[in-house]
């Protein structure tokens, strides 16, 4: 499991110095209904004839790459890719070394 703090001090390209950044997880936006491919697909699908293009079934990956979105105090935003992981946590409790396991 990957646990990342909600704030991180890192370099800002705009300020050109190390500043505190607010960390969030990137989420993809809603796909546009007016993109050329979507318009073409909808036009082809309309009317009689069923499914016109193959539906993708051969899914290979079980995880997605984690993308962090960091915002500087000046407002500049940058993104950083982490490795693949099954479980990701933002600002969770930090593990301590000499603590007994709680049941």
From Swiss-Prot:
It comes from the Eukaryota. Keywords: Ribonucleoprotein, Ribosomal protein. GO terms for cellular component: cytosolic large ribosomal subunit. One of its GO terms (biological process) is translation. GO terms for molecular function: structural constituent of ribosome. InterPro entries: Ribosomal_eL44, Ribosomal_LSU_eL42, Ribosomal_zn-bd. Residues 37-56 are annotated as: Disordered. Belongs to the eukaryotic ribosomal protein eL42 family. PANTHER family: 60S RIBOSOMAL PROTEIN L36A/L44 (PTHR10369). This is Large ribosomal subunit protein eL42. It comes from Dictyostelium discoideum (Social amoeba). The lineage of its organism: Eukaryota, Amoebozoa, Evosea, Eumycetozoa, Dictyostelia.
